[in-house]
Amino acid sequence: MAEEVGSGEVVARGVRAVEDLPAGLVYAGVSLGVLPAQRLAQTRPGARGAVLLEACLPAAAHGGWPAGLPVQVHGTAADPFFAGEGDLDAARALVAEADDGELVVHPGDRHLFTDRSLPSYDAAATALLTGRVLELLARV
């Protein structure tokens, strides 16, 4: 999709999608969906947190991580996109910058491991991810 419309358009569509929603949200994205989710978490007033799955941008992409904003990042250790394209390094730096940050690196090399419709689905990793995300949501 990003190749067809461009990553800027993906972000713009994500931002437009939440225009009429209340401010107090936790923003979540999977893979390419992390682009708008992370931007909204870092720039939309009233954000309550962020859950970034299988991708992460440097916090500086949107002016630094907001003080006190919880963030959770999940990905697999050898995912060619998450680990191989710099997202894991960006996630480590972001979590180090955040007051309330958690990076969960799951074993394996699968991308989109939470999508049960794909061969890359990993039920055990998805169960762990779900538990951690629910804990975060209960806190915010």
Model regions and ranges:
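Serine-hydrolase catalytic machinery in alpha/beta-hydrolase-like enzymes
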Residues: 1-24
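Gly/Ala-rich beta-loop-alpha elbow adjacent to hydrolase catalytic centers
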Residues: 28-37
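A conserved short beta-strand
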Residues: 45-57, 70
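Conserved serine/cysteine hydrolase catalytic core
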Residues: 59-70, 78-80, 135-138
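Conserved alpha/beta-hydrolase "acid-adjacent" motif
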Residues: 80-90
